[in-house]
UniProtKB/Swiss-Prot annotation:
UniProt xrefs under InterPro entries: P-loop_NTPase, Shikimate/glucono_kinase, Shikimate_kinase/TSH1, Shikimate_kinase_2, Shikimate_kinase_CS
KW Magnesium (keyword) present: yes
Ligand binding (ATP): G12, C13, G14, K15, T16, T17, R120, Q155
SUPFAM superfamilies per the UniProt record, alphabetical: P-loop containing nucleoside triphosphate hydrolases
Region annotation (LID domain) ranges: 112-126
Taxonomic path: Bacteria, Pseudomonadati, Pseudomonadota, Gammaproteobacteria, Enterobacterales
Cofactor note: Binds 1 Mg(2+) ion per subunit.
Pathway terms, separated by semicolons: Metabolic intermediate biosynthesis; chorismate biosynthesis; chorismate from D-erythrose 4-phosphate and phosphoenolpyruvate: step 5/7
Assigned EC number: 2.7.1.71
Residue sites binding substrate per the record: D34, R58, G79, R139
Required cofactor(s): Mg(2+)
Full protein name: Shikimate kinase 2
Any GO molecular function: ATP binding
Length: 174
């Protein structure tokens, strides 16, 4: 598989964890767009959003997406990358998009276990369970629109990777 693989989904669905495992399984490079952007900017996402706003952050996110897209690369994207139609189109045209789908309860449980508050600024200012439910309701259709494959991410990272590898093999065989 030489095309980039883009992992999309909400906060807490496991894009980074699964992405690292998938890259190992596919003998590919791995890039997390949030991490790459923060390293390049020398600031956290929360700092960028606080000082420059969401619009500036989303523009930087688009630049990052294009900069890291390369053959034989697994790319964990930020949860909101699909908000821009041009990002959804870019990923679909230049690679394979996998939506890591999980129920709200699973996402909330993971986010409460690993809050990483500095990296994950609130999107709505509401309690985490309300925010996750609201954001997923707004974005689920966009994740599905962007995705070539939808994978249940409520399982272990190893199981999720196994399902992705199977889906990719079936896609290549057809």
């Amino acid at each position: 598989m030489t095309q980039p693989i883009f992992l999309v989904g909400p906060r807490g669905c496991g894009k980074t964890t699964v992405g690292l495992e998938l890259a190992r399984a596919c003998q590919s490079q791995f890039v997390d767009t949030d991490h790459w952007l923060q390293t390049k900017a020398g600031r956290t996402i929360a700092e960028i959003v606080e000082k420059e706003g969401w619009e500036t952050f989303r523009a930087l996110e688009t630049e990052t997406l294009k900069a890291v897209s390369a053959p034989s690369t697994v790319i964990a994207t930020g949860g909101g990358i699909i908000l821009a139609e041009h990002n959804r189109g870019f990923m679909r045209e230049h690679g394979i998009v996998i939506y890591l789908c999980a129920p709200v309860a699973t996402l909330v449980e993971r986010l409460e276990a690993f809050p990483e508050e500095g990296q994950r600024p609130t999107l709505t200012g509401k309690p985490i369970s309300d925010e996750v439910s609201e954001v997923l309701a707004e974005r689920d259709a966009l994740y599905r629109e962007a995705a070539h494959h939808v994978v249940d991410a409520s399982q272990t990272p190893e199981q999720v990777v196994s399902h992705i590898v199977t889906a990719l093999r079936l896609a290549c065989a057809s």
